Amino acid sequence: MASMGLQVMGIALAVLGWLGAILSCALPMWRVTAFIGSNIVTSQTIWEGLWMNCVVQSTGQMQCKVYDSLLALPQDLQAARALIVICIILAVFGVLLSVVGGKCTNCVDDESSKAKIMIVAGVVFLLAGLLVMVPVSWTANNVIRDFYNPLVASGQKREMGASLYVGWAAAGLLILGGALLCFNCPPRNDKPYSAKYSAARSAPASNYV
């Protein structure tokens, strides 16, 4: 029962992490304009995402534009787009494996095979979590580096957007859920000990004089 509880918790955390990765990928809030200095137009906020950028006016009006080309993205966001998409696909594969190997499903009858499938699902979720962690941390590092770089103009400085925090949370959930599933050890097939008896040999009769 405890093993089944770990499975359910691991799958639930991994699914939440997968949904968080989708949200982080879709939200155009990876980098947000930093209002520094007097030359920044404070009446608008610029959001930069993986697929589009948005301009939010002080009146609340928002205009979004999809990137015309992949080359319009900086290098870190190009890599982030590819890695996040791979992560989402991997997580879908992990969810399917966890359904097949779940203790409450009848897709596979052998308990040992179920446990092995669940361990593979856990490894897949761990890889998906790392694929989210790398681009999010890379982008955050570039934002912080440019923010404190005196050679970068004030108008080019950005702050970390909400998508980065969502991505970190998604990575943590995927890694934690995958780790719980990896603890699902296959059952031992210990055969009961059977005592074997051999017939005692009769000693040859000795002749006494």
UniProtKB/Swiss-Prot annotation:
Modified how: Phosphorylated. Phosphorylation by EPHA2 is stimulated by EFNA1 and alters interaction with TJP1.
UniProt GO cellular component terms: bicellular tight junction; chloride channel complex; plasma membrane
Q: Which cysteines are joined by disulfide bonds?
A: C54-C64
Q: Where is this region: Interaction with EPHA2?
A: 1-103
**Topology feature Extracellular, residues:** 31-81, 139-160
Region annotation Interactions with TJP1, TJP2 and TJP3: where it falls in the sequence: 208-209
Q: Which residues cross the membrane?
A: 10-30, 82-102, 118-138, 161-181
Q: How does it sit in the membrane?
A: Multi-pass membrane protein
Q: Which Pfam families match?
A: PMP22_Claudin (PF00822)
Q: Name one GO biological process term.
A: renal absorption
| Alphabetical keyword list | Cell junction, Cell membrane, Chloride, Chloride channel, Disulfide bond, Ion channel, Ion transport, Membrane, Phosphoprotein, Tight junction, Transmembrane, Transmembrane helix, Transport
Compartments where located: Cell junction, Tight junction; Cell membrane
The family database entries (InterPro entries) matched by this protein are listed as: Claudin, Claudin4, Claudin_CS, PMP22/EMP/MP20/Claudin
Quote one Gene Ontology molecular function term. Answer: structural molecule activity
Q: Residue positions of the PTM Phosphotyrosine?
A: Y208
Cytoplasmic compartment spans: 1-9, 103-117, 182-209
The similarity comment for this entry is: Belongs to the claudin family.
What does the UniProt function comment say about this protein?
Channel-forming tight junction protein that mediates paracellular chloride transport in the kidney. Plays a critical role in the paracellular reabsorption of filtered chloride in the kidney collecting ducts. Claudins play a major role in tight junction-specific obliteration of the intercellular space, through calcium-independent cell-adhesion activity.
PANTHER family recorded for this chain? CLAUDIN (PTHR12002)
Q: How does it assemble?
A: Interacts with EPHA2; phosphorylates CLDN4 and may regulate tight junctions. Directly interacts with TJP1/ZO-1, TJP2/ZO-2 and TJP3/ZO-3. Interacts with CLDN1. Interacts with CLDN8.
UniProt protein name: Claudin-4
UniProt source species: Bos taurus (Bovine)
